Amino acid sequence: MPQFMSPAEKGFILSRHWKDTRHGVEVSYWLITDNGPRKVTVPLQQAIAFVPLSSLPAIKPLLDEQANLSYRPVELSDFRREKVAAIYCQQYRQLQNLDKRCQELGIELLETDIRPCERYLMERFITAPVWFSQNQQGEYQLKPCDSYRPLIKAVSLDIETSQYGELYSIGLSGCGDNVVFMLGPEQGSALNNTHRLVYVNSRPQLLDKLNEWLQQYDPDAIIGWNLIQFDLNVLQKHAERYGIPLQLGRQGKKLEWREHGFKQGVFFASAEGRLIIDGIDALKAATWNFPSFSLEFVAQDLLGEGKAIDSPYDRMDEINRRFHHDKPALAHYNIQDCLLVHRIFEKTDLMAFLQERSTVTGLAVDRMGGSVA
């Protein structure tokens, strides 16, 4: 009997996720659609790797002792044009452990580094735009849809701190709102009507306000300038200090971090259901080049305008002075940085470039520096 499927809808992949369960690998995606964000979960998957047929006898005893594992020859070849067998595991962690044991035997398994959420897309020739439909069990099926380019709703985030990294304020511009959350005591209202100025009594309350704003306005993307290595890094340290989760993902999911495999002290950040895009990395990915990638230099070059503090030499002193004696002026400086980043993205059409790159290559929209070979 044919399985009923809901009418197909168009979506564009924002983020990709997987987790092991007792019965298989759960794979899900957050999409932008014409009807808002959607989280879709596909039927349970197996974790898959390959091994040259010539190496199969050496690891066959190891494979045969594994529960919830199967293997068989397939009509595929490796780069040496040797036929391979596919190995199917019920959990991805099981496959990773198997890979380690095979390495100890001097046998290399192929494609063990491909995450289940990436493999699902690859095997269906899906890059970023998709058709999706749902069956009676609530599971989704995805198919490629090359023509869909939705509007990505972005918020520009910028923070101000002391020279010691102590948080002064958080500025947000996007989704119809411009606001600065400022550590008190209160020193007056916003200098003009371009933004709201909201005072709070403590740094934990600054983090709470950020979490609340993101859940209320629900952006598809968070953009900024040196966003991950500075702004989000400082916010994460404050979150750990005060025991407050940094809920930058949709459905209140916490910000996730991983360290660069080769560059010490360089980190990647991800938020479920949202893109995290650093303006500097995005411009470089789009082959823009400047003598300096400082926000002041790029803004002056592209927009003919710059920061709300003219001199770069005593900028830190001026930020400290404004925080202690003129908080409305600091809020103006903070929101101006947010607005500059937005205008740079618009001027260079960066978001459209990143969507197109993702559609052509299959790289995540906010993935920077990956190979497209």
Where are these regions (language model features)?
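The two-metal-ion catalytic cores of nucleic-acid processing enzymes
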Residues: 1-280, 285-373
